[in-house]
From Swiss-Prot:
Keyword tags: Cell inner membrane, Cell membrane, Chaperone, Membrane, Protein transport, Transmembrane, Transmembrane helix, Transport
Source organism of this protein record: Prochlorococcus marinus (strain SARG / CCMP1375 / SS120)
Gene that this sequence comes from: yidC
InterPro entries: YidC/ALB3/OXA1/COX18 (IPR001708), YidC/Oxa/ALB_C (IPR028055), YidC_ALB_C (IPR047196)
Protein name per UniProt: Membrane protein insertase YidC
Lineage: Bacteria, Bacillati, Cyanobacteriota, Cyanophyceae, Synechococcales
Main function: Required for the insertion and/or proper folding and/or complex formation of integral membrane proteins into the membrane. Involved in integration of membrane proteins that insert both dependently and independently of the Sec translocase complex, as well as at least some lipoproteins. Aids folding of multispanning membrane proteins. Probably also aids protein insertion, folding and/or assembly of membrane complexes destined for the thylakoid.
Family: Belongs to the OXA1/ALB3/YidC family. Type 1 subfamily.
Transmembrane stretches, start-end: 20-42, 93-113, 260-280, 303-323
Region annotation Disordered: where it falls in the sequence: 356-382
Amino acid sequence: MIGFLSDNLLIPILDFFYGLFHSYGIAIVALTIVIRIALFPLSAGSIRSARRMKIAQPVMQKRQAEIKSRYANDPKKQQDELGKLMGEFGSPLAGCLPLLVQMPILFALFATLRGSPFADVPYLVNLKILPPEQIAAVEPKPFKSPRHSIFISDKDHFPVIASLPGGTKIAAGDSVNIKLETLSGEKYSNVLGKFENGSKFSPTWKLTKGADLASVSADGTVTAKYPGDATVEGKIPGLAAKSGFLFIKALGQVGFYVDGAINWDIAILVAGFGLTLVISQVLSGQGMPPNPQQATAQKITPIMITGMFLFFPLPAGVLLYMVIANMFQAFQTFLLNKEALPENLQKILDDQIKNQGKKELATSPAIDSERLPFEPKSNKQN
């Protein structure tokens, strides 16, 4: 499904914007905004639900406990009352469905930006090399890799898969050829022959595991030597992997620290991701009473996630998408937080803010020293 959405929805939109602006960087920004706008109704539902549950949760938990205690011996009545409670405040799971519906599209968008034309495309084949006397008992199971859209030019691209008709289990001493082909079965090498620059997109093959157990030639032929596990990688260059955008040196560049040097464009993108994450988090808590139990987690989470992406091998094009998506999310949260709440939730929120103010006043160290003559004394014991 991810491949289908990428090939039939996202890449055509990408082609359209590249045709308009002749910049893959602008095309990424435009594609991200278009998809986020299209998903606005779904993501808005999740944000609204999360906002309402954040307000209603303390009251709901208290009333749920009361209902379960009061009707402990009457399960039917208990379920009826819990159902009424959900009807009043909504289900805590209501925001999950819109999120689940949009996830395939977001995963497809992520996969599109991790592949051609923005990055080199790897095809991995895991081989099981067996002793010759054991191979006769193995039933061949044809292998096909996930498909990837390969760009040969700005307008020419097609899905390509890697296949092994005889399967991934081979005998020591045998040789097999890993085939790259289109979905219609045409050899990838034949397709490249139709383009003047086709040779630039020829795959390179190497063993990433079990180099002492097998060898692989330039045409993808694997020769097994000894029993064991081996992994073969065929990599096709990305058309726009070396294209820059604004301060980004190459959209396909991966890694914050490579060969003893810092890639400052990656560092800026990761920092931008962290900053937009914090802004979105702050906006989501606007107008809400502070929650000391969640305060520490809210401070640490953005730092942990941002730090993780410093060392996670994501292409610069994907990081650009993540920054733009976070900016859109923050703007969306800002707009939705301006919406009026239902009357019952607004009353709960007002009470929570009022009670929070009373707690802060009661715990103030200057409360007794600044007490007016007509105010009652605090219960503080000397």
